[in-house]
């Protein structure tokens, strides 16, 4: 129960931060038009969709609380790659971002393995601070 509350807080922090930056959340969950149909998790990790002026983004929110951070990274990279390809087919004008908490950025993404992942997988990242309830850094490739 405590973990679910933490995960919900992470999700809300990202939504609130995007709205504070002028984004309009258009979908709290995103369903891909695929066979079989894929949709994002209803609990911990969610994909949200937002628009600002002419920009459109989809954001896969990760907590990096559930497993080892290396295992979380591997899972996140697999989802990111699949979601990005599906999004290119479904809505090519929408950019996919992976939102990660500050602790995950510092422990994984700012280090060698994370930097390689950012480069090889062409990750677009939003680093968010749960305590301050705001995005700290946008990394665009």
Segments the model singles out, each with a brief description of its role:
Residues 70-93:
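Basic, amphipathic alpha-helical patches used to engage nucleic acids or provide basic targeting signals
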Residues 23-58, 72, 140-141:
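Active-site metal-binding core of divalent-cation-utilizing nuclease and nuclease-like domains
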Residues 2-11, 15:
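Nuclease catalytic cores
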Residues 124-141:
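Charged phosphate-binding loop/patch that engages nucleotide di/tri-phosphates or the phosphate backbone
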Residues 61-73:
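Short beta-strand-loop-alpha-helix junction that forms the active-site gateway
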Residues 85-121, 128-130:
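Nucleic-acid nuclease catalytic cores
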Residues 43, 62, 131:
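Anionic group-transfer/hydrolysis microenvironments
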């Amino acid at each position: 129960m405590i973990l679910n509350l933490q995960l919900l807080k992470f999700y809300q922090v990202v939504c609130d931060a995007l709205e504070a930056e002028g984004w309009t959340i258009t979908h709290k969950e995103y369903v891909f038009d695929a066979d079989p149909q894929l949709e994002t998790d209803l609990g911990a990790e969610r994909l949200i969709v937002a628009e600002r002026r002419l920009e459109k983004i989809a954001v896969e929110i990760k907590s990096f609380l559930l497993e080892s951070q290396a295992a979380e990274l591997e899972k996140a990279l697999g989802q990111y790659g699949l979601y990005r390809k599906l999004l290119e087919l479904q809505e090519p004008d929408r950019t996919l971002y992976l939102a990660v908490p500050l602790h995950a950025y510092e422990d994984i993404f700012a280090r060698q393995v994370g930097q390689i992942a950012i480069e090889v997988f062409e990750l677009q990242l939003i680093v968010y601070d749960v305590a301050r309830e705001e995005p700290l850094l946008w990394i665009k490739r």
